[in-house]
Amino acid sequence: MKTGEVRLWKLTRRHVREALEAGQIKGAILPTGSTEQHNEHLAMEHDAASALHVSYQAALELYPQVLVATPMNVGISEHWMEFPGTLTLQADTFAAVAYEICDSLRRHGIEKILIINGHAGNGPLGQRMDDFRQRLGIEVRFHSYWEAYSKEYIQEHMESGEAPAHAAEFETAFAQAAFPENVHWDGVDYEAANLDIQSESYRDRDPVYFR
């Protein structure tokens, strides 16, 4: 694979075949996220875009050893369905799709897969990794990208001291740095200290707000 490209969906079958035959590809990353409301100022693709951004940067650092599989852009978001535009899957459906993608990669000879998650609501998938490994016979792991940051780091660098929260300081800062075109401030009222534009009742409806 001499293209410098790590995103599977951008490659041709020849690119992938030659890289596999040469033994270049050692593993794959599967980004998982959501299409859901992120308050008034962040795009609905935020979680999926964040997971893809982290996955892409990691794979570039490891080129040509790692492929980025096609992202799962819809996740477990039932708790946000009252907000128009949100899409959701049942937990079993979400897990089944993730499993089938991992199995597809396995069938092509990839034996190490890292699921990089960008949506806290997808957390139940992490509890299925033992089952995935047993059934697939390969190494599969699940990590949410914000787990790379310690509590101490977050408290030092974030005014709110919270991560990932939901569409608050952490996610807004990530979007501003990675894809600023997805941040829309027009008409948005927020608390400058921590970008907390969410009411207490809004927080109460989010079961994963403080994860």
Predicted regions and their residues:
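Extended, histidine- and acidic-residue-enriched regions that form the cofactor-binding/catalytic faces
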Residues: 1-114, 118-211
